Amino acid sequence: MIRRQARERREYLYRKSLQLQEATKIQKRQQLKAALASGKPLPKDVADDEELRKTIAYDESVQDEIDDEYSAMSGITDPKVVVTTSRDPSTRLSQFAKEVKLLFPTSIRLNRGGTVLPSLVSACKTSASSDLIVLHEHRGVPTAMTVSHFPHGPTAYFSLHNVVLRHDLPDTGNMSEVHPHLIFDNFTTDLGKRVVQILKHLFPPGVKKDSARVITFANRGDFISVRQHVYVKTREGVELAEVGPRFEMRLYDLRLGTLENKDADVEWRMHGFMRTANKKDYL
C-alpha cells in the first residue's frame, strides 16, 4: 500500500511538472508574439530561451488554397511546360533538352537563340504557359535545371549529376509519349513535399490505367534519382526496361517568385556548411 501511494505520488508530481512546463512555454510564446506585434524588446528570459527559439512557430495559421500557387490548375488542366536551354547551347545540351521535352508529355521545346531572360519569361506568361524549364551546362555537360512556375512562382534550382542520355543507353528504342505513372519515393519532410508538389505539376493529372510508362523520382540523401521505365506483363510477371534519360538532381535554392525576379523571397537555400552535414537529410 505504501509503495503504491509513493508511486502514485511520483506520477502525480511528474504530470504536474509537465503541465507547468507546458504552461511556461505557452506563456513565453504569448510574450514573444506580443513583442513581435508591438515592436518592443523581448524579456531576457524569453530572448535567452534556445529551446523556444527552435520550436516556436512564428506563423501558426493554417495554409489555405489561396496560399497554394498550384490550386488553380491542380487536377483540372494539363500543364503547358516550356523546355529551353541557356544561350548558345552545345550539341549535347540540345539533345538533352529534346529528351527532357519528351519526359513531360504536354511540354514544348523552345530554341532560345539570343533571347534574354526577362523577355523569355514575358513570352511564356503571354502564351499562358504554366512552367518554364531552363537547362544549363558547363563545357558540354548538363549541370543545372531551373523550374519556374507561372504566374507567381515558385522557382526551384537543381544541380544535375551523372546525366546519361538515351542514346548512351543500349536498346532504348522509341520513347512512348503516353501519360506516365509517377512514383515519388522517400520525400518525408515539408521541404520534400514541396519539391514533390513542384515536380508532379509538370505532368498531366488523372488516372493512367492503360499506360505502360513509369517515371520515378527517388530521394536518396537529398539526391533525387530520375529514372524512366516501360513495363510489359508476361506470364512470369512484369519485365522492366529503362528508356532514359537518367540523371540525379539536387535542390540548392527555392524562391517564391518567378525566374527573372532576382529579389524574390528565398524559401530555402543550401548554405556552404550544409555540404558537410551528412547526417541530416533535408528532403
UniProtKB/Swiss-Prot annotation:
Signal peptide: none annotated. SUPFAM superfamilies: Class II aaRS ABD-related. The keyword Nucleus applies. Keywords: Nucleus, Ribonucleoprotein, Ribosome biogenesis, rRNA processing. GO terms for molecular function: rRNA primary transcript binding; snoRNA binding. GO terms for cellular component: Mpp10 complex; nucleolus; small-subunit processome. One of its GO terms (biological process) is rRNA processing. Residues 79-260 form the Brix domain. InterPro entries: Brix, IMP4/RPF1. It is found in: Nucleus, Nucleolus. Component of the U3 small nucleolar ribonucleoprotein. Required for the early cleavages at sites A0, A1 and A2 during 18S ribosomal pre-RNA processing. Component of a heterotrimeric complex containing IMP3, IMP4 and MPP10. This is U3 small nucleolar ribonucleoprotein protein IMP4. The lineage of its organism: Eukaryota, Fungi, Dikarya, Ascomycota, Saccharomycotina.
